[in-house]
A protein has these predicted regions:
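Charged, alpha-helix-forming regions
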Residues: 1-159
Length: 159
């Protein structure tokens, strides 16, 4: 609201105010990137990597299975098997984060026998060429991104 003397008063909704309190994270998140995610798991991974990217002493982290599920925001009782977790949450999140953000993220499963016991997560900032590619993908429509990233061909059909 603008007062007669020219002062401008404004307020933030409570939810946004809570988010802004943690300005160290919010300042690192790019609104354009955040709006471009189609996966909630990609958004969660992007937020967590943004928190870690400035750590000069750490570029990898080992996570047990539950820690990775928590990091991605996978709800309890959902995506129970490793196959489902990988196919429905982890791979789409990695694909999207690596395609449209300035970060390069890898998450490698560590096994004991056939069982996955933990994950090694690594992150870095892309080089100039990688940044250009991410920016170019960010400018393209969301529709068809999944096919572009997987290498599947898609075409528009005239009716």
């Amino acid at each position: 609201r603008i007062k007669p003397n020219g002062d401008l008063n404004y307020s933030f909704p409570v939810e946004l105010a809570e988010l802004l309190k943690d300005s160290s994270v919010f300042a690192k998140l790019d609104l354009e990137v955040m709006k471009s995610f189609s996966s909630k798991y990609a958004f969660a991974l992007y937020e967590e990597i943004s928190r870690r990217i400035g750590l000069s002493y750490k570029m990898t982290e080992e996570l047990d299975v539950q820690e990775l599920r928590d990091l991605l925001g996978v709800e309890d009782g959902k995506l129970i098997t490793h196959h489902n977790l990988r196919a429905k949450a982890l791979e789409p999140a990695l694909s999207e984060v690596n395609a449209i953000t300035p970060y390069q993220v890898t998450i490698i499963p560590k096994k004991k026998g056939r069982k996955v016991i933990s994950f090694l997560m690594g992150w870095s900032i892309k080089d100039v060429e990688g940044m250009k590619e991410a920016h170019a993908e960010l400018q393209r429509p969301k529709i068809g991104r999944k096919d572009r990233l997987s290498g599947a061909s898609s075409s528009v059909v005239e009716s």
